């Protein structure tokens, strides 16, 4: 069983990361473990920026957005020599367990630390994109969803006033979950996501059909990277003769106090990660095959090998086809 653990946040920040850190710290302390917070993700691990945490270090953190430990992208961590230094920094402090909060790239780093250095690593899915395999939802997804829906509601007010078509670009990388959920909750008329082939002409055809039925304004929700929003807006305006404007929500989607569900999810996952590290889950985990990651499926905490969850065939979360069918029926 581990005696000292580290916790870090890596990659893009997500609301609820602080709640997850809090869950890890307080659960670990209740098991008699020492906990070290690692600043700025793997970058801080490499530069040996660590500090011991107690229960008061995470007081008043459950409601705070962002991550008080800081986060950074550190592609140099792919270099084995860089990882050797990071491992040595942990071993000098006696750290034998590590909780990594982030996306699949962060998971990959954790898995390497386990395989190369014997550190017992557990990953928690922290990303607004909801694109991590092995879990129904990721920490931060529902808070980002509230942010996007609020923006859609505001855009609908002005779009209806001016009989305008509004395009909303939503984060998600190669996963359309956030766009899809926001489109349903925001009552969007049209949607474009990576999981379904997107063609401008098909979208315009749908918009024209809506106009023919008497539709005077519309909201189009589209996942980032599918198209250039400004160019798409000009194309739609030219083809439909309706004023069209694009709005890129950007990094505002990552900020804000986490909603209640994200706080609960993060707390449960943090505590479950500690349970895995202290062998409270039966049967005890065998870290000789690599690190593990935590997920929630049907509202129950689950775990799986990181290598399974980041495998190409499992890398993306399962497309919510039933959600998409519902959205199409309601357009």
Curated annotation (Swiss-Prot):
Record: residues binding ADP: 22-26, 55-60, 156, 187-189, 213, 215-217
HAMAP family assigned: Phosphofructokinase_I_B1 (MF_00339)
Documented activity regulation: Allosterically activated by ADP and other diphosphonucleosides, and allosterically inhibited by phosphoenolpyruvate.
Keywords for the protein's UniProt record, in alphabetical order: Allosteric enzyme, ATP-binding, Cytoplasm, Glycolysis, Kinase, Magnesium, Metal-binding, Nucleotide-binding, Transferase
Top-level taxon: Bacteria
Molecular functions per Gene Ontology: 6-phosphofructokinase activity; AMP binding; ATP binding; fructose-6-phosphate binding; identical protein binding; metal ion binding; monosaccharide binding
EC annotation from Swiss-Prot or TrEMBL: 2.7.1.11
Organism: Yersinia enterocolitica serotype O:8 / biotype 1B (strain NCTC 13174 / 8081)
Reaction(s) catalysed (UniProt annotation): beta-D-fructose 6-phosphate + ATP = beta-D-fructose 1,6-bisphosphate + ADP + H(+)
GO annotation, cellular component aspect: 6-phosphofructokinase complex
UniProt pathway annotation: Carbohydrate degradation; glycolysis; D-glyceraldehyde 3-phosphate and glycerone phosphate from D-glucose: step 3/4
Name of protein: ATP-dependent 6-phosphofructokinase
Residues reported to bind ATP: 12, 73-74, 103-106
Annotated Mg(2+) binding sites: 104
Subcellular location field: Cytoplasm
Gene: pfkA
Assembly information from the UniProt record: Homotetramer.
SUPFAM superfamilies named in the record: Phosphofructokinase
Residue positions of the active site: 129
Functional note: Catalyzes the phosphorylation of D-fructose 6-phosphate to fructose 1,6-bisphosphate by ATP, the first committing step of glycolysis.
Binding site for substrate: 127-129, 164, 171-173, 224, 245, 251-254
